[in-house]
Amino acid sequence: MVPALRYLGSVCGRARGIFPGGFSAAHTPASGKSRLLCQGGRRASTSSFDIVIIGGGIVGLASARALILRHPALSIGVLEKEKNLAVHQTGHNSGVIHSGIYYKPESLKAKLCVQGAALIYEYCNQKGISYKQCGKLIVAVEQEEIPRLQALYERGLQNGVQGLRLIQQEDIKKKEPYCRGLMAIDCPYTGIVDYRQVAFSFAKDFQEAGGSVLTNFEVEDIEMARESPSRSKDGMKYPIVIRNTKGEEVRCQYVVTCAGLYSDRISELSGCNPNPRIVPFRGDYLVLKPEKRYLVKGNIYPVPDSRFPFLGVHFTPRMDGNIWLGPNAILAFKREGYRPFDFSARDIMDIIIKSGLIKLVFQNFSYGVNEMYKACFLSATVKHLQKFIPEITISDVLRGPAGVRAQALDRDGNLIEDFVFDGGVGDIGNRILHVRNAPSPAATSSLAISGMIADEVQQRFKL
């Protein structure tokens, strides 16, 4: 196993029914049965694969693509519990192509983000996917933030981020005329893209290479086939049985899981370690009214607090022309709870009993209260935004979309910040690779992550 590879996960997003280039997505039939979504060229239908990827978000699809391009003779399938691909984290993120400035030097996050950003730009150019390299300013608005800003600049240089420079008030105004600040880091390599479109393109590549995508397949059990080898040829070649909530089965030799918000539960289903546990954090965005979009040209971020993995409330242009403001970071009461009152008793009990959330809350009580306050009172978020663009008023913003971040947490209440691979022991454990924690910048890093996953699969499973 690659020594540095431990912590990693999946990202998901929302499909619209059509892939770029007119590649149609088949919707689930009225019966609710699982079906192939734009089946690959190898089979008209199948229930057996050499490799199965669980999870149809951007990391799962990028990994499936990388594996089939590297091993075209293998049959590879993707299982997705939703009717369409990329329904959750991929489709609810900010759409930023991160440069790699924030992350600890030599960490997987830093290495994969810098590599991944270059690969995403190259891929979008090859496929004709629209993006904007609009840059980013990380702005210090208080004197006490300047030492942290300078340290962040040095970190970016260590990580090999392209084009970084420290700028003063005069240059801040040249790039963002309505933004106030004492000093800023100019990150010209940062961009924006629609990651759903990127994910759909990965799926198109995968299926055109012969891969199959099975949607509406919510995994309920993973176990070894019970038939004896003498009685079942299928049991010999495809010893793992993956069963969904409707009792349908898929068999395979090896499994890679990229299950995002459910990565701990899928690991537990296979008899592997459920830790680190996933704690869902909801992030609510505001949207700048169209007549006020002139106030923001590119991404504007605050100087981050190194105690937390969240980057703070920021200004993010979107490919559709909107300007998103946010997000906050508050506990979600459901793993896919995009609305404030979405609730799951099971999810809440898991969070309270099985994770280190209680310790995290006590360690960061004031931060949590502040985030809850901003979520409840629009004026609190606007007041924070006014530190950067004083002209913004509460009448200039509307409540916007929300996303849920799958944050891994250990039993001591520590946030797991880096990507992690995990496996297991025994008959199933030796045939499975779990892709676990996938915090930002997993979408930016998806192509770099997929290459690492393909390397790990090849080495672990002796392909």
Swiss-Prot record:
EC top class named in words: oxidoreductase
Transit sequence range: 1-52
SUPFAM superfamilies, per database record: FAD/NAD(P)-binding domain
GO cellular component: mitochondrion
Keyword terms: Acetylation, FAD, Flavoprotein, Mitochondrion, Oxidoreductase, Transit peptide
Keyword Repeat among UniProt keywords: no
Needed co-factor(s): FAD
Positions of modified residues (N6-acetyllysine): K104, K173
Chief place where the protein resides: mitochondrion
GO MF annotation terms: 2-hydroxyglutarate dehydrogenase activity
Protein name as catalogued: L-2-hydroxyglutarate dehydrogenase, mitochondrial
